[in-house]
Amino acid sequence: STILFADNGLNLYGNAVLVNEAFAEENPEAVKGFLRALVKGFSDAVADPAAGVAAVLARNETLNSDIELERLGMANAMNIKTPYVIENGFGDVDMDRLAASIETLKVSMGLTGAVAAADVFDAQYLAPAAERMLP
């Protein structure tokens, strides 16, 4: 049985791509290209989990393919191909959810200062939603 934070009131984002603002401004096509490649990799792993696991095993032979396939299946079902992603495409965020996450982190980690969701997420580098839909 799996206990999910989101099922228990902690609806935080679990993964993010971070980029230095100066780098992004100076190299927008590199950032866009990286994000397109990331979406392609996730799309491929959702479409063919066994091939996704094989790609990981090629880089880390100590892993167990059966366990990794089970783990990827769980991740795809619970964290990657979510209802929000199905509707909006991979890589975008719900700004209200992100704002609430920031507030939760401020309280739990004792952070101070005003941080808006728009301060930490910029969708301008994402491909159009139609190009970010998972299979």
Language-model-derived ranges and their functions:
Residues S1, Y13-V17, E21-A22:
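Small-molecule pocket liners
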Residues L4, N20, D94, D122-L126:
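Helix N-cap / beta->alpha transition motif
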Residues L12, L18, V85-N88, K106, ...:
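Residue-level signal for pocket-adjacent positions within structured domains
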Residues S1-A6, E68-E70:
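Ligand-binding "clamshell"
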Residues F5-Y13:
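Short Pro/Gly-enriched coil loops immediately N-terminal to beta-strands
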Residues L98-P135:
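Conserved C-terminal helix/tail region of periplasmic/extracytoplasmic solute-binding proteins
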Residues G9-L10, F23-A24, G41:
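Short, catalytically relevant binding-site loops at active-site mouths
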Residues E26-G110:
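Secondary-structure end/capping motifs
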